UniProtKB/Swiss-Prot annotation:
Subcellular location: Cytoplasm, Cytoskeleton
Native source organism of the sequence: Picea abies (Norway spruce)
Protein name: Tubulin alpha chain
Family annotation (Pfam families): Tubulin
Keywords: Cytoplasm, Cytoskeleton, GTP-binding, Hydrolase, Magnesium, Metal-binding, Microtubule, Nucleotide-binding
Top-level taxon in the UniProt lineage: Eukaryota
Name of the top EC class for this enzyme: hydrolase
Cofactor(s) the protein needs: Mg(2+)
Family: Belongs to the tubulin family.
GO cellular component: cytoplasm; microtubule
Function: Tubulin is the major constituent of microtubules, a cylinder consisting of laterally associated linear protofilaments composed of alpha- and beta-tubulin heterodimers. Microtubules grow by the addition of GTP-tubulin dimers to the microtubule end, where a stabilizing cap forms. Below the cap, tubulin dimers are in GDP-bound state, owing to GTPase activity of alpha-tubulin.
């Protein structure tokens, strides 16, 4: 999904936009999904969370891995095996505070939430 967003907005895998690209400039929808770093990279406004680590590891090793800050990629050590109680009370409970903290940090950086 994110790869499609980058392609639609002309963002390269290193997060940079070619200088001749005007897609997204001044566009509120564009700024909803991406923020620009001090170095000019366009990075997603997202936190990825999964109790099962292999899914998040695909993002960590994928073509666009440079665009995700490691703090935005949160994974557990094991999945909940499709068991709500296990995900809510045991395995998931271990990372819920970390997830809430990361989402709070992203929300703090928003100008109009």
């Amino acid at each position: 999904c994110w790869e499609l967003y980058w392609l639609e907005h002309g963002i390269q895998p290193d997060g940079m936009m070619p200088s001749d690209t005007t897609v997204g400039v001044g566009d509120d929808a564009f700024n909803t999904f991406f923020s620009e770093t001090g170095a000019g990279k366009h990075v997603p406004r997202a936190v990825f969370v999964d109790l099962e680590p292999t899914v998040i590891d695909e993002v960590r090793t994928g073509a666009y891995r440079q665009l995700f800050h490691p703090e935005q990629l949160i994974s557990g050590k094991e999945d909940a095996a499709n068991n709500f109680a296990r995900g809510h009370y045991t395995v998931g409970e271990e990372i819920v505070d970390l997830c809430l903290d990361r989402v709070r940090k992203l929300a703090d950086n928003c100008t109009g939430l």
